[in-house]
């Protein structure tokens, strides 16, 4: 059993830039080496690059409205209370819609495998849905 104090002790919140478009802030909750849990705040229009997780990823939307899209073409508009599961190694991206922020809790299984930046045309098409 492991009881976490609600965030990783001694690790500050950080602004993420290298694999995100727009302003994104992350607050580390738990890192066991196998499972990483973060609270992530996306400002309007901000989103991840394409990425995947060898053990899959669970997202729980806690504020605002967002988008989750996969390489297979699935696009979902999500809101508070929605839960998203991406299968192991499923390439996807997620972030806020253009008119609102989105906050989610991300439970990632295994090391994130980062890919290319999401094309602006792809983000715009998904956001319009």
Predicted regions and their residues:
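Short acidic-glycine-tyrosine-enriched beta hairpin
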Residues: 72-88
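Short, conserved beta-strand element in jelly-roll/cupin
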Residues: 41-43, 52-68, 107-110
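Conserved short histidine dyad/triad with adjacent acidic residue
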Residues: 36-53, 88
């Amino acid at each position: 059993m492991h009881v976490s104090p609600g965030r990783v002790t001694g690790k500050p919140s950080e602004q993420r830039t290298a694999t995100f478009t727009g302003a994104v802030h992350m607050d580390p909750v738990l890192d066991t080496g196998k499972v990483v849990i973060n609270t992530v705040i996306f400002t309007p229009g901000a989103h991840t690059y394409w990425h995947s997780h060898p053990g899959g990823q669970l997202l729980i939307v806690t504020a605002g409205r967002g988008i989750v899209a996969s390489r297979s073409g699935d696009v979902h508009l999500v809101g508070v209370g929605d839960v998203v599961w991406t299968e192991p190694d499923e390439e996807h991206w997620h972030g806020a819609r253009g008119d609102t922020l989105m906050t989610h809790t991300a439970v990632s299984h295994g090391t994130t495998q980062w890919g290319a930046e999401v094309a602006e045309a792809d983000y715009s098409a998904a956001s319009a849905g």
